[in-house]
Amino acid sequence: QNLEEILKAFFFFYLPIILPLHPRTKNAIEQFELTHYLHSKNIQVCEPLGYVDTQSLIMNATMVITDSGGVTKECYYHKVPGILTDKQTEWVETVKEGWNIQAGPSAKKIIDAYLNLKIPTTQNNILGKGEAAINTAQKLNELLNKS
C-alpha cells in the first residue's frame, strides 16, 4: 500500500521523473501489479545508479523524492529540496531547516509537499561544511610529525 501511494503521487507531477529502481522494489511493483503507475511520459525507469551518477542527478534536480537517508543528506549538501516518503528520518535537522519535507508514504501528502515547496534562502551547514576528511588528515599529519 505504501509503494502504491508513492507511485500514485508521480502521476501528478509534470516534471520529468527519473526513477532508479532497486531490484526488490521492481519485483514488488510487478508482484502487486502496480506497473501501470510507471506508464507515464514523464517517468523514466532505470537500473540503480552508482554514487557519481546519483550525485549528478541530485545536483541537476528541481527536487528529489526519496526514502533514502543518504539521499536526504545529499539533497541538503547540494541545496536541492527533498520530499521524504519515510514516516521518520534520522536527518531531522534538514527538515527543521526546510530543505526536506517529511511527507511519508501518502500520495496526498507528497503532492501537498510539492505544491507548498519553498526553497530556503539560507543554509546553516548543520551537517558540517564537508571538510571532515581534510581536518582529519591535517590532525593525523600533525600527530605524525610530533613523533
Regions found by a protein language model. Give the residues of each.
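Nucleotide-activated sugar donor-binding and catalytic core shared by glycosyltransferases
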Residues: 1-13, 25-147
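Short internal beta-strands
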Residues: 16-23
